[in-house]
């Protein structure tokens, strides 16, 4: 009887004292769901589910909500969304800064990957416009003609991303550089339309210039960004400049609601450590855009194949 009592007491001490450290760790986070926003490009949605999968492995509850890629930072600020994981400096930096300056949004660090977002072309299309990637090659009428489509009015067409991403930045640039008589800018409905255009142009034997970014699945396929005049602070029209400049490279940040470290301290600690590089992010996108997996299945596969990458962040 005495031995049995000792065993029971020892078991209680083990349980209450943290013998099961993983249970203790997950137990200190709130049961309220961590709300992760999803947008309209593959790496972002796959990464949302990758992060959600990591959080669920730690015992957290996760909820995914579609959100506008500009307005999401205000949603984080007021607590409707918990975190953002792909804050692209060029596209979303101003919206992020505006929300952060109001209070309620925390900068939760950068990914290892650096970003570029600009107009460019698949390497096989260079033959249609000798002189690329120098932007001056776009001044050639023959070049523009080789990039014309039925909806471009005889001009060369550039296919931008959704207008919600950058507003009229690219049309303003084309006009500022004196290319408006030869080129027109159209807006894609989403990232899928950009990738469909790549396939269509190759099949039809014409050139194509699209908006693209890195990190992305196209990193391994051969894609070149056009060398526009260098970016400098203040060169864009929104900042009072003439718009005659390309895009800078930039950060890829994480953002969280200010209460996240208080309500979910272990999750917040993991998320602070989390950092993906260019090849990892490109691989996530490729599972959807090339392998045609669903975002959810792509995330499950990435997590299963890369435990050595992410499990250390949960320790």
Whereabouts are the PLM-identified features?
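A conserved helix-loop-strand patch within extracytoplasmic ligand-binding domains
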Residues: 104-159
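Ligand-binding pocket segment of bilobal, Venus flytrap-like solute-binding proteins
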Residues: 81-86, 157-232, 237
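A bilobed periplasmic-binding-protein/Venus flytrap-type ligand-binding module shared by bacterial periplasmic
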Residues: 117-128, 249-263, 286-287
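Short helix-initiation/N-cap motifs at beta->coil->alpha
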Residues: 39-42, 60-75, 185-197
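Short, well-ordered beta-strand elements
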Residues: 29-43, 60-65, 155-159, 271
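An extracytoplasmic/periplasmic, membrane-proximal ligand-sensing/linker region
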Residues: 32, 43, 165-184, 188-205, ...
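Short, polar/charged alpha-helical segment
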Residues: 42-61, 173-174
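Pocket-flanking alpha-helical
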Residues: 48, 67-103, 193, 217-222
């Amino acid at each position: 009887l005495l031995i049995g009592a000792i065993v029971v007491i020892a078991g209680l001490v083990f349980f209450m004292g943290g013998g099961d450290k993983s249970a203790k760790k997950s137990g200190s986070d709130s049961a309220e769901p961590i709300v992760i926003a999803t947008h309209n490009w593959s790496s972002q949605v796959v990464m949302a589910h990758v992060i959600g999968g990591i959080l669920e492995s730690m015992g957290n509850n996760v909820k995914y909500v579609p959100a506008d890629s500009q307005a999401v930072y205000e949603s984080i600020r007021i607590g409707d969304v918990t975190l953002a994981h792909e804050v692209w400096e060029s596209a979303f930096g101003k919206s992020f800064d505006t929300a952060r300056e109001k209070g309620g949004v925390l900068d939760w660090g950068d990914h290892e990957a650096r970003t570029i977002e600009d107009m460019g072309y698949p390497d096989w299309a260079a033959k249609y416009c000798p002189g690329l990637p120098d932007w001056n090659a776009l001044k050639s009428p023959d070049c523009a003609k080789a990039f014309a489509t039925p909806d471009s009015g005889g001009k060369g067409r550039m296919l931008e991303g959704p207008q919600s991403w950058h507003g009229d930045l690219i049309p303003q640039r084309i006009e500022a550089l004196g290319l408006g008589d030869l080129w027109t800018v159209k807006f894609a409905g989403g990232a899928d339309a950009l990738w469909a255009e790549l396939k269509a142009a190759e099949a039809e034997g014409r050139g194509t210039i699209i908006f693209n970014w890195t990190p992305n699945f196209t990193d391994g396929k051969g894609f070149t960004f056009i060398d526009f005049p260098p970016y400098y602070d203040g060169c864009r029209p929104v900042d009072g400049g003439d718009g005659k400049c390309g895009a800078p490279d930039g950060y890829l940040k994480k953002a969280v609601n200010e209460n996240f470290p208080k309500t979910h301290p272990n999750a917040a600690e993991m998320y602070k450590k989390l950092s993906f590089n260019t090849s990892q992010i490109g691989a996530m996108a490729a599972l959807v855009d090339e392998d045609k997996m669903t975002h959810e299945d792509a995330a499950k596969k990435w997590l299963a194949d890369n435990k050595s990458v992410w499990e250390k962040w949960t320790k």
